[in-house]
């Protein structure tokens, strides 16, 4: 079983029609292999628009592939910046935004970064889709509170940082 299988099952999400099956590699190898697989898929599908989310290597690979092909790219979660060039995700964010035809920013701060990079004319403030997803699944998570592992005390407060 793959790590992603649990998300498909738990949240009732259909499995993707296309899975490139790239797996973990160095940033360069992973990005290159995704670009190769995406190029073939995009040419076959011939979409009107391509949507890329976030700041992962797959996001950057999608942006570069679209910039070399006749496909328009919209970046969801655009404009986020840490101003830390040591983070690989920071490069992915900046390059993806500059390759994109349309930018959907989650915050006012993200919009400001995009304006500073002369990308304001193609940027739109849309809110944070991760918060939307959390609100969507919150009720199903709350219903499953009785199924907590015995080691978790429901009367205690916990902090969880989740990066998907």
Go through each PLM region and give its residues.
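N-terminal glycine-rich anion-binding loop in soluble enzyme alpha/beta folds
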Residues: 1-16
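A nucleotide-sugar donor-handling region in carbohydrate enzymes
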Residues: 1-2, 21, 99-161
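Short, solvent-exposed amphipathic alpha-helical segments in soluble enzyme
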Residues: 9-12, 67, 140-142
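Active-site and donor-binding regions of nucleotide-sugar-utilizing enzymes
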Residues: 7, 19-118
């Amino acid at each position: 079983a793959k790590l992603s299988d649990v998300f498909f099952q738990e949240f009732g999400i259909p499995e993707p029609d296309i899975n490139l099956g790239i797996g973990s590699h160095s940033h360069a190898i992973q990005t290159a292999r995704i670009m190769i697989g995406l190029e073939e898929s995009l040419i076959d599908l011939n979409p009107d628009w391509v949507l890329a989310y976030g700041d992962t290597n797959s996001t950057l690979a999608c942006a570069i592939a679209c910039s070399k092909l006749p496909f328009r790219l919209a970046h969801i979660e655009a404009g986020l910046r840490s101003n830390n060039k040591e983070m690989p995700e920071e490069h992915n964010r900046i390059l993806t935004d500059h390759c994109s035809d349309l930018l959907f920013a989650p915050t006012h701060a993200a919009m400001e970064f995009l304006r500073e990079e002369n990308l304001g004319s193609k940027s739109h403030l849309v809110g944070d889709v991760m918060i939307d997803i959390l609100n969507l699944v919150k009720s199903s998570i709350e219903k499953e509170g009785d199924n907590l592992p015995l080691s978790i005390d429901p009367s205690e407060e916990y902090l969880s940082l989740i990066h998907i």
